Amino acid sequence: MDLRRWFPTLYTQSKDSPVRSRDATLYLLRCVFLMGVRKPPAKFFVAYVLWSFALNFCSTFYQPIGFLTGYISHLSEFSPGEFLTSLQVAFNAWSCSTKVLIVWALVKRFDEANNLLDEMDRRITDPGERLQIHRAVSLSNRIFFFFMAVYMVYATNTFLSAIFIGRPPYQNYYPFLDWRSSTLHLALQAGLEYFAMAGACFQDVCVDCYPVNFVLVLRAHMSIFAERLRRLGTYPYESQEQKYERLVQCIQDHKVILRFVDCLRPVISGTIFVQFLVVGLVLGFTLINIVLFANLGSAIAALSFMAAVLLETTPFCILCNYLTEDCYKLADALFQSNWIDEEKRYQKTLMYFLQKLQQPITFMAMNVFPISVGTNISVTKFSFSVFTLVKQMNISEKLAKSEMEE
């Protein structure tokens, strides 16, 4: 099978190929379309609406309700391990549904961001610069498929381990289905739960990976922009007016970068904030399940779930730290350009521009948390607090004892 033919943007194009930064989100936006949150195409209007209803009803709306209803109606029938397996996913399912609704409301901003990437592309002329963008595009798409693989491995592992022991993966509540009554009901409920969870994982990939896809290609443009700033004033045959025009063009380039960031900021702020709220709790329940209750199959599924949860915030938080460093490099590059012997107008404009470049690009989670590695570590450490609390209160022993008595 020729993957290059079917997935060309997974591979780095030659430096002579035209630049298309928007290809960094090619597969992401195709999957966003399959989430059913786009305007239905005229040709497949009915099919798209039906698909959108089925996926979002099962994964976005009913699944969080099904978890809660299942706890209310059948809590006494859960073993401690089964309850924690279900609970860790329930919190993540509730957060996933919230993130999907945020992206659904703001999905047009992805198209606006891609239009701004097209503006940045028009400034790319050098073959070396084109190659740099091509590398960012291929890396971005490979990361998207890596996310998809990790999330889907979790959903499938949980499904298979549950079927092996003869129970539905999460024991959600479905009207008219009692999986204890017959093998047919068990198969139907397990299939429904797997469809809902696979759909939720598919949605989660899109709402978790889009910041990484967009910021990766932004960093490539910022690296090229830094070299453009460093070369200011070094062209010997330019007049003073031409040098000034080149500086003004760089200021315009920086404004496009800021518009790109401002375009994505509301979406990123909402989705990352939601994830920060639940990541510590979810990881804490997962640790308790792995250490105290899980059998081998459940432990493998829980470990893959933990990897998926860590992917939801960690890569983007790392990129945010790198993005801050990139901004400081822009200021250094401008200061290193040949400006000392230029005219007063050029120097004043450059100094004003330098002050703007020294203001780093940062993302905030609903103006509450700065999105950074430090914040990610802080919220992740909360999982150890949850684990320690459960250990000190001997909750695990009490749960195990109650299960033995039953």
UniProtKB/Swiss-Prot annotation:
GO molecular function, one term: odorant binding
One cellular-component annotation, GO: dendrite membrane
Keywords annotated in UniProt: Cell membrane, Glycoprotein, Membrane, Olfaction, Receptor, Sensory transduction, Transducer, Transmembrane, Transmembrane helix
Spans within the Extracellular topological domain: 66-86, 164-181, 293-298, 381-406
Pfam families (UniProt xref): 7tm_6
Biological-process GO terms, alphabetical: detection of chemical stimulus involved in sensory perception of smell; olfactory behavior; signal transduction
Entry membrane topology: Multi-pass membrane protein
Transmembrane annotation, as ranges: 45-65, 87-107, 143-163, 182-202, 272-292, 299-319, 360-380
Residues bearing carbohydrate: 394
Leader peptide range in chain numbering: none
Function, in words: Odorant receptor which mediates acceptance or avoidance behavior, depending on its substrates. The odorant receptor repertoire encodes a large collection of odor stimuli that vary widely in identity, intensity, and duration. May form a complex with Orco to form odorant-sensing units, providing sensitive and prolonged odorant signaling and calcium permeability. Involved in the behavioral responses to butanol, ethyl acetate, propyl acetate, and pentyl acetate. Also responds to pyrazines.
Subunit-structure text: Interacts with Orco. Complexes exist early in the endomembrane system in olfactory sensory neurons (OSNs), coupling these complexes to the conserved ciliary trafficking pathway.
PANTHER family for this protein: ODORANT RECEPTOR, ODORANT RECEPTOR 19A-RELATED
Note: The atypical heteromeric and topological design of the odorant receptors appears to be an insect-specific solution for odor recognition, making the OR/Orco complex an attractive target for the development of highly selective insect repellents to disrupt olfactory-mediated host-seeking behaviors of insect disease vectors. Odor-evoked OR currents are independent of known G-protein-coupled second messenger pathways.
Family listed: Belongs to the insect chemoreceptor superfamily. Heteromeric odorant receptor channel (TC 1.A.69) family. Or2a subfamily.
Official protein name in the record: Odorant receptor 42a
Species of provenance: Drosophila melanogaster
The organism's taxonomic lineage, starting at the top: Eukaryota, Metazoa, Ecdysozoa, Arthropoda, Hexapoda
